[in-house]
UniProtKB/Swiss-Prot annotation:
Active-site positions on this chain: P2 (schiff-base intermediate with dna), E3 (proton donor), K56 (proton donor), R260 (proton donor)
NCBIfam families noted in UniProt: fpg (TIGR00577), PRK01103.1 (NF002211)
Gene encoding the protein: mutM
SUPFAM superfamilies attached to this UniProt entry: Glucocorticoid receptor-like (DNA-binding domain), N-terminal domain of MutM-like DNA repair proteins, S13-like H2TH domain
Residue positions binding DNA: H89, R107, K151
One GO BP: base-excision repair
Native organism: Acidovorax sp. (strain JS42)
ZnF start-end (FPG-type): 236-270
Keyword terms, alphabetized: DNA damage, DNA repair, DNA-binding, Glycosidase, Hydrolase, Lyase, Metal-binding, Multifunctional enzyme, Zinc, Zinc-finger
Quaternary structure (record): Monomer.
Entry's Gene Ontology molecular function annotations: 8-oxo-7,8-dihydroguanine DNA N-glycosylase activity; class I DNA-(apurinic or apyrimidinic site) endonuclease activity; damaged DNA binding; zinc ion binding
Domain of life of the organism encoding this protein: Bacteria
Cofactor note: Binds 1 zinc ion per subunit.
Name used for this protein in its record: Formamidopyrimidine-DNA glycosylase
């Protein structure tokens, strides 16, 4: 599933090119996770004012309303003036005078939803309840630590839930906890101020590095210009079960938490 770094990389790869574009048409294929929420003709003539990100959602601001885009489990966006003919898994196109934005989504768990604004119930249903933006200025340590202290959930699962900090997916949660030296099964409320500060810094560091490396391409992720990500090539623990820890040589272990694979070093992450 594309996580925060992949969504941010996608945003950066087409935001400048589509800004100021006028919508000329909409193509809707097979149904996605949620309906568009308006007739496609309503969007024709609208101007694209910018592209933002909130967690794993892209917000395409129009001069009237906005489009919320989620890539689902296997989705990716492409933006270009001359895209090849639509394929069987291309389910949405925003055709503009500056190029076409196309959603490719084989499993159809993604979505494109129109809302009149961020206060629209359709937008609030998708955006409300998420935690702090880890790459934003409001990612304050005090607020983050207070969120940890209030939860008895194992820290790995709390990171994935997105209610304290948003967008830390499975790969990045494993890498963040390794960098912070915290075992994934440790209860969030048991993490004291010193370790919480290390965790806070590790979240910023890992996600920023992942964006810099173009995200992670495990199966089919690519950005809107077709580029693959490379962060997975330098992972310390993710996908390395049984291999020696890059830091101490102890074999990396694998366990299951909430139906997700968790990788950690039992020596470097003792508690």
């Amino acid at each position: 599933m594309p996580e925060l770094p992949e969504v941010e990389v996608t945003r950066r790869s087409f935001a400048g090119a589509i800004e100021g574009a006028t919508v000329r048409g909409i193509t809707v294929g097979k149904p996605l996770r949620w309906p568009l929420g308006t007739e496609p003709a309503v969007l024709v003539g609208r101007r694209v004012c910018g592209v933002r990100r909130r967690g794993k959602y892209l917000l395409l601001d129009l001069d009237e309303g906005l489009l919320l885009i989620h890539l689902g489990m296997s989705g990716s966006l492409r933006f270009a003036r001359d895209l090849p003919a639509r394929g069987a898994h291309d389910h949405f196109e925003l055709i503009t005078d500056q190029g076409t934005l196309r959603l490719h989504d084989p499993r159809r768990f993604g979505a494109v939803v129109w809302a009149a604004g961020e206060s629209d119930p359709r937008a609030r249903k998708l955006l409300d309840g998420w935690g702090l933006e880890p790459l934003g200025e409001d990612f304050a340590f005090e607020t983050f630590h207070a969120g940890l202290r209030a939860k008895r959930t194992p820290i790995k699962q709390l990171l994935l839930a997105g209610t304290v900090v948003v967008g830390v997916g499975n790969i990045y949660a494993c890498e963040v906890l390794f960098l912070a030296g915290i075992r994934p099964t440790t209860r969030a409320c048991a993490i004291g101020p010193q370790r919480a500060r290390r965790l806070h810094g590790a979240i910023r560091e890992v996600l920023a590095r992942a964006v810099e490396r173009g995200g992670s391409t495990l199966r089919d992720f690519s950005s809107a210009d077709g580029s693959a990500g490379h962060f997975q090539l330098e992972a310390n623990v993710y996908g390395r079960a049984g291999l020696p820890c890059r830091q101490c040589g102890t074999p990396v272990r694998l366990l299951r938490q909430g139906q997700r694979s968790t990788y950690f070093c039992p020596h470097c992450q003792r508690a």
